[in-house]
Amino acid sequence: MAAEPSKTGPSRSAYQRMGRKSQHWGAADIQCTRCGRRVSRASGHHCELQCGHAFCELCLLMTEECTTIVCPDCEVATAVNTRQGCYAMAGYVKEDSVMEKRQPKTIKNCSQDFKKTADQLTTGLERSASTHRTVLNSSSVMLDTNTAEEIDEALTTAHHNFEQLSIAGKALEHMQKQTIEERERVTEVVEKQFDQLLAFFDSRKKKYNNKKGLSCYDTYPPLEKKKVDMSVVTNEAPPPPLQPETNDVHLEAKIFQPQKDVVATASSKTIAVLPQMGSSPDVIIEEIIEDNMETCSTDDLGETPRYPKKPLQKNSSVPFGSKAGSAELVFVSHVIDPCHFYIRKYSQIKDAKVLEKKVNEFCNRSSHLDPSDILELGARIFVNSIKNGMWCRGTITELIPIEGKNTRKPCSPTRLFVHEVALIQIFMVDFGNSEVLIVTGVVDTHVRPEHSAKQHIALNDLCLILRKSEPYIEGLLKDIQPLAQPCSLKDIVPQNSNEGWEEEAKVEFLKMVNNKAVSMKVFREEDGVLIVDLQKPPPNKISSDMPVSLRDALVFMELAKFKSQSLRSHFEKNTTLHYHPPILPKEMTDVSVTVCHINSPGDFYLQLIEGLDFLFLLKTIEEFYKNEAGENLEILCPVQDQVCVAKFEDGIWYRAKVIGLPGHQEVEVKYVDFGNTAKITIKDVRKIKDEFLTAPEKAIKCKLAYIEPYKRTMQWSKEAKEKFEDKAQDKFMTCSIIKILEDNVLLVELFDSLGVPEMTTTSINDQLVKEGLASYEIGYILKDNSQKHIEVWDPSPEEIISNEVHNLNPVSAKSLPNENFQSLYNKELPVHICNVISPEKIYVQWLLTENLLNSLEEKMIAAYENSKWEPVKWENDMHCAVKIQDKNQWRRGQIIRMVTDTLVEVLLYDVGVELVVNVDCLRKLQENLKTMGRLSLECSLVDIRPAGGSDKWTATACDCLSLYLTGAVATIILQVDSEENNTTWPLPVKIFCRDEKGERVDVSKYLIKKGLALRERRINKLDNSHSLSEKSLEVPLEQEDSVVTNCIKTNFDPDKKTADIISEQKVSEFQEEILEPRTARGYKPPAIPNMKVFEATVSCVGDDGTIFVVPKLSEFELIKMTNEIQSNLKCLGLLEPYFWKKGEACAVRGSDTLWYRGKVMEVVGGAVRVQYLDHGFTEKIPQCHLYPILLYPDIPQFCIPCQLHNTTPVGNVWQPDAIEVLQQLLSKREVDIHIMELPKNPWEKLSIHLYFDGMSLSYFMAYYKYCTSEHTEEMLKEKPRSDHDRKYEEEQWEIRFEELLSSETDTPLLPPYLSSSLPSPGELCAVQVKHVVSPNEVYICLDSIETCNHSNQHSDTDDSGVSGESESESLDEALQRVNKKVEALPPLTDFRTEMPCLAEYDDGLWYRAKIVSIKEFNPLSILVQFVDYGSTAKLTLNRLCQIPPHLMRYPARAIKVLLAGFKPPLRDLGETRIPYCPKWSMEALWAMIDCLQGKQLYAVSMAPAPEQIVTLYDEEQHPVHMPLVEMGLADKDE
């Protein structure tokens, strides 16, 4: 028995060793150098070698026999004691190691039942050991006596022990499986609980779906994140990004609580809080904070935490706020202005309190700053905030030393000792405000106003309220990002943009948001600033008097306005849709109009009387907006000049434009098609569809000409307005366009009739004067009513060039005599833009001259207010005083030119305005008023040129620049000319101004960006340089004998050779030269031969009757030049976008793919109407077939425009039928030209007599009543014949009388065809429709005739086989017989109207026909009608022949009839009309053909000849025209 303790020693020792391993879990371990496995230093399962390396048993593979170990790394041998005894329990050690691995997991994480089972297992093992003490003791005795029996008994006991251990291992495996199943069961229960909570959350969420982005989303994240947190059960911390924001502290507590509390914590805390998700955020946050206060122990600040904690702020890695459009609750922490304020997230209250507690603990425990401590710009610091009443985190934003001024220079230090600081400014990163700390003793004058405006305090020692940050507190707070987020209200600006935000706006802003939780809707983020709107939170969250929208409230209170209301620059206006301007009639023309709106005789609107397109547009707009709900087209925030559709007081929608924003949900609109205005509510305004924008405005603003208010009063009297309305309102009138004023205002004279013949017209202008309601303007001369218009001739090219040169000269070298511009070059000079004409003509005033201008105006008024007009002989460049009637002002001016005896064009050189005034408005300028220099400068933008390839600025560019600059204050920089030292005029400048954003804009770059200008390329000017046309495309003739005399007569020498063609130019050089813009020069006028009579070829006849001829002597030169043009223009590339202008010379590629010289006549959309200079005819072609280049400018135009001398067309203009005759008669024909009168202008028409084949053209046209001539007798005389003419006649016109007896010239005199007759009226007969002219005009054939013709076909041959003519032979048989021998029939020689003949149809057969008219003369073509079918065709002579007489006995089958029962519709919307019968549409014609084709028809005659009217019926006795009536293509005619 005494030996028993010794026997149990090994077993007890083994279990004690197992227990020690469990107790030392977490003590220092030894890591294997090779495999990295860690083992306990106390376990003894390792070996530390003498070389310093440590290895585990597995890596060394030691046995008891080993006495030395060689290190696997450094191969150093180490002696080992093989009797350490640690190897005897190898088996137990292995089992123990397995359990050791399991123990931390299973025991720490399993349930309480599992722990109990493990304890029972340990007790059982101990009992098993005690049971076998005797055996073990026996085994030890056996070892001492070396008896075999004891050895056997010991082996039996060991075997039994191993069986017990095997049973215990199986029990452990069973327990582990149960643990896994229990964990899965618990997970399933928790997931079901979360599903229930999610369903509860969704129901609450749907209830308040209008605020689905509130902070509850951030406070309680989605379920998926919480499911991941079940990893706590396995002791694996979830990844930080997936941890929910509100449960951070709970997770920390779960991880480090004892294992017995794990399940209890999950059930008591988490489940208790989650059902309150739908409740107020205040309740949720308070519960979380109460739970966390204990966790955040104050001791944590003074010592290193025992366990590594995860950061409290889990959303720091996520950007602030939700997605665009979401909403959440926030506090406004600081307001600078409505576009600059800071907010704090409502869901971050917990973080804010934690942050406050930690910062207060740190600042209260830490020591004060030392005067030798260093402060650095941008460094983090803690400050005891005055405004916030607590210690706050801050960033140093400004440091000013004591010895320096209160302005930090760029080179001043950014690091200062505390005792050197005079002023420090700190930005509170968690609140958004800045505070200024000023050390006592700093002079007040050094403190800037912005410092005083900010929260500031004066103190003796900065160290008292500042604490410097330390690394460990930074580590604790590094994950709590700054809580203040900068924000700006979306799309609002101050009510007065120039003055900025008023203090009242900030005050009202604070009243609405201060100390309130508001809902913030995020739109987007710009440069770290959230663009938001602050709104009223849901009613169930927080009761508040916050408005529904804060920005709407500020706008409503007129403290702000929407940004769209402030964008008034032309840049923004260009992005707004606009109507096309109204189409204006030409000056000095008469048009039919209706007066649609009248404000006064000087301000009214009219519409041109056109087609029905405008009425159709009004109807379409009315139907669309009447049936449209309007929700998608509502205008919530109208903008000035916005196009729209507005409802009028009659309830109908019309096109309109916003012209005023009076407020109170009202807008003022102008109805652009009528001219009237109205103030309506915003509900009666709709957005306009694009399809309604295409039509131009219909209302044209006008002013009555020649008259002004009675007795020169400033305004029209009420009686004058009423009388004018009574005479003109909504009436059709004739309007005479006198002049087109600025802004497209027409100066007109109205007449009270539409120009009805034989009806006297009355001028409304004169009527108002006669009735004493108006007066004639000063200087107006009563005109003779018989001569209403005065002919105005276009100036000659010489006059135009002279005027252009005159206008380009500076007004006067004395414009600014006292200005030294050399000293102002390259300096920024402030100016006021007073007038903009084009980018190369801008008038500016120095800002300093404003007082001078006002003083000058006062002097002018005092000098000329009561002055009387005196006759003065005005001349160019004279100085004068000008009265501006509209503004009742007097200005200094200088006469530019005398327009007429009573009208003068003057330059108001103090404001840069040019205008035409009556001489009554001029006075002599007093000498004392000339002493002051001119107050405006004429400038020109540099480094730009017009876009589109033109050398002239487009009206669009001028209007854009004028709208953008006129009246603006800008900065100019005078540009120095590198080549010339003297001052050029206009002054070359660059102009800079501010846009609506306050950014500096270069006006030249602005025009380039708009596509209205191109950057000017600077090219070195060489004296010997030439343009491309002068270098490679001009092939001038020799100059000795080819001199133009007085621009009229030219000697042509056919033997003269042209100059040598210059060498070929490279394609690249050619294209580079072409693409450079150049001034378009004109071609020389046509050279008229210096002979009285010359031969010529008619190239074409113009649409106005102008005859273009090319002299025979010039044809060779024309062909030669044409060939050379083709060889020189083979390598032209694609043309860049080019702006064509009227009269510009160009190269034209014709339909024959050849190049010709041309001139632009008109630009029509994407096409250009051009004239071929050397051939005369015009054509409309695409712009891609033109090239802006001069071809041989030294060679005159070859074709000469001519007109018949003393010949007056009927109606004073050549009618279309007369022009058609001229074109057919003369085109490509050789004629004789007799020059009667040379033109005064070389470009005008040459007056001639033209003879073709010896006949005078004037006589020919007068004979056929196309014109009248004053010299008919002279023209009847035989034209002078030369020897050449006589020879020509003898060769060409020699006719023998024998030919007159030939059978070919014998044309029988035939009677007209017999007519077929219809049955008596009321009788029904079967008919066939042979030809349809229009829906109610057809040719029919009686069906009985057709049947008879086919039934009577039989052979009429005699016994000899020769056919004969039988009385019973049908027409078809006779025509078949004639078609077999048609070659033998004589040709037709008589072409009089109604002449019977045979004509060949398209099927190659010949049919009976008659001549209708001659359609063309060269070549001759005849219009014929097939009498048996009614159809017509235009045929040449080879398809006509004489008709055999026996075919004349058959009556014409086709009968022309008019169909009764229907008529053209009053309203037919079909666009395509029948050209020869426009009252019917093509759709109606095709529908009628469908009704007639392939049907058996019957006709009932309604009226006898000559105009036969029938009604057609189908087989069912229904009128055939009823489908047309049902389709709306015809109206029933009762």
From Swiss-Prot:
It holds the Pfam family TUDOR. Residues 637-695, 873-932, 1139-1196, 1390-1450 form the Tudor domain. PROSITE patterns: TUDOR, ZF_RING_1, ZF_RING_2. The keyword Transport does not apply. A zinc finger (RING-type) spans 32-75. InterPro entries: RNF17-like_TUDOR_rpt1, RNF17-like_TUDOR_rpt2, RNF17-like_TUDOR_rpt3, RNF17-like_TUDOR_rpt4, RNF17-like_TUDOR_rpt5, SNase_OB-fold_sf, Tudor, Znf_RING. SMART domains: TUDOR. It is found in: Cytoplasm; Nucleus. One of its GO terms (molecular function) is zinc ion binding. GO terms for biological process: cell differentiation; spermatogenesis. Keywords: Cytoplasm, Developmental protein, Differentiation, Metal-binding, Nucleus, Repeat, Spermatogenesis, Zinc, Zinc-finger. SUPFAM superfamilies: Staphylococcal nuclease, Tudor/PWWP/MBT. Residues 1-22, 296-315, 1352-1373 are annotated as: Disordered. One of its GO terms (cellular component) is cytoplasm. It comes from the Eukaryota. PANTHER family: RING FINGER PROTEIN 17. Interacts with MXD1, MXD3, MXD4, MXI1 and PIWIL1. Self-associates. Seems to be involved in regulation of transcriptional activity of MYC. In vitro, inhibits DNA-binding activity of Mad-MAX heterodimers. Can recruit Mad transcriptional repressors (MXD1, MXD3, MXD4 and MXI1) to the cytoplasm. May be involved in spermiogenesis. This is RING finger protein 17. The gene is RNF17.
